[in-house]
Amino acid sequence: MQKIKKVCIYCASSENIDPKYFEATEKLARVLVKNNITVVYGGGSRGLMGRLADTIIAEKGRIVGIMPHFMKEVEFHHKDVNEFIFTADMHERKKQFMVGVDALITLPGGCGTMEELLEAMTLKRLGIFTKPIVILNAFGYYDHLIKMLEFSIEENFMKPIHSDIWKTFEDPEKVLEAIHQSTPWSKDALKYS
């Protein structure tokens, strides 16, 4: 079993969400710190992004923020994050999220979080990105998205093998188990995309 050293987390910047999502984020952050895993994330100081960073910093873990310059200029960046990478734009930011990570983890979020997740799934489908993609379906948040993905397979817009692109889990403390249970993926995936 490969040791997980670095993960990227996609998550929300919204502050107006149910406290249960913040609690799930804290639990996941603590598991990652306990296992000495570096976290790469969007660099924000608000919403789940802020709670993720605050928890990792409080627990003495390592977190890296990646953010376009224009977002720093309006003070969205978390000033206490260990390391920051500032990019020219959102496209470069998404590329940097995937550099050197052992897995991608998606927490509840809005259109930005879902867009990042779906792009990662597309890149995996094409064999460009081959690491585990796990979705924290806390409190059934992603039920409708998962049903839509399954429906796209049923309707032959994707193949049955594409259901192995992602793995869902509901308990934030089971994140490492979800990563390790993910189906290995090949760069040859383009052949059956």
Regions found by a protein language model. Give the residues of each.
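Short glycine-/polar-rich loops that comprise or flank the Walker A/P-loop
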Residues: 129-131, 164
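Alpha-helix capping at helix-to-loop junctions
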Residues: 113, 123-129, 151-158, 181
